[in-house]
Amino acid sequence: DPQKPIYFNGKYHYYYLYNRGYPKGNGTEWRHYVSDDLVHWTDEGVAIPKYTNPDGDIWTGSVVVDKENTAGFGKNALVAIVTQPSAKDKKQEQYLWYSTDKGKSFKFYSGNPVMPNPGTDDFRDPKVIWDDQDNKWVMVMAEGSKIGFYESDNLKDWHYTSGFFPEQTGMVECPDLYMMRASDGTNKWVLGASANGKPWGKPNTYAYWTGSFDGKEFKADQTEAQWLDYGFDWYGGVTFEDSKSTDPLEKRYALAWMNNWDYANNTPTMKNGFNGTDSVIREIRLKEQDGTYSLVSQPIEALEQLTVSTDEIEDQDVNGSKTLSITGDTYQLDTDLSWSELKNAGVRLRESEDQKRHIDVGIFAEDGYAYVNRAATNQPDKSNTYVESKAPYDV
């Protein structure tokens, strides 16, 4: 899982769950990377190691900059609240770690756990934000099929305020809460979570709801979740502020774990000696259309600095199919598709010389969806359940 990046001392700091002993060993810890541009990253090593206290390994949580020293560890200390299984009965509880060396290492708080388990199996993935209106910390927590809301003045003492009970999302993990300014100028709160919508024909990715938040309770504009990603490999997603922007509500950034629990240990990279990849960072904005507010996203512009050459193709009229003389291992394709009678219009990418390996991307106009089909790749799902992802599109 990625942990929500923070901007501190002129750099983005990014922590993620790392298991140095995989697949023979077990247990995760927090590894630390820094970046100036969200494209190039420098490895700073493990910041919160596992098994250094009687409780279990380090799971997902979040880290904040305590600008006003509310926790008492010093002004601008970094404070992380993470889930660990307790030493006594392996129940999921929340533990506080703090850093006074700019995030390079963290110390275990002597008063842990700051949130003992209330008697539930699922009690994890705390996401902490600062509430400017009420001058307090707010936390959202994954609690099975529920998202719990909590508040604190000092990051140590937490009090339950409300619960949000989504429909047709199954077990939720890695909740998210933030405000955005929509395209029509309206400010909206967004509550997100990685959810499991497969039983209802929905994705297993990042579900979200727009609505209002009064500091204690979130009220959704509509009960049905929307989805930021319709693919198969965008789970454990986090969003974070564009800290360099003069208007931080205008857009956010997002990234996620590129995997799926149904085949998490069967990825193609296993033959290369590792398993686990996080996505490129995307930019997200909130768009209003016909009274509904929805997140839209695209890869960040900073990726364009990696471009070393550009090819432009003139307009092509196609009746059937046509092969273009463009090759490459890594590229960005920008194209406009228009059609008159075709039911299926698209492009075939990364085709091998024998034409047996390729990825198909296109629009099935008759049924109103865009698709990505990876059947002819070394895709990890041997059940062929996760072969073609479909997403609605605006005409």
Swiss-Prot record:
Q: Does the keyword Iron apply?
A: no
Instruction: Report the subcellular localization.
Output: Membrane
Q: Where is the active site?
A: 1
Q: What class of enzyme is it?
A: hydrolase
A Gene Ontology biological process term: sucrose catabolic process
**Keyword terms:** Carbohydrate metabolism, Glycosidase, Hydrolase, Membrane, Transmembrane
Q: Where does substrate bind?
A: 59-60, 124-125, 173, 261
Do you know which SMART domains this protein is assigned to? Answer: Glyco_32
What Enzyme Commission number(s) does the record list for this chain? 3.2.1.64
Q: How does it sit in the membrane?
A: Single-pass membrane protein
Catalytic activity reads: Hydrolysis of (2->6)-beta-D-fructofuranan, to remove successive disaccharide residues as levanbiose, i.e. 6-(beta-D-fructofuranosyl)-D-fructose, from the end of the chain
- InterPro entries the record matches: ConA-like_dom_sf (IPR013320), Glyco_hydro_32 (IPR001362), Glyco_hydro_32_C (IPR013189), Glyco_hydro_32_N (IPR013148), Glyco_hydro_beta-prop_sf (IPR023296)
Q: How does activity depend on temperature?
A: Optimum temperature is 55 degrees Celsius.
Record family assignment: Belongs to the glycosyl hydrolase 32 family.
| The name this protein goes by in its record | Levanbiose-producing levanase
Q: Which organism is it from?
A: Geobacillus stearothermophilus
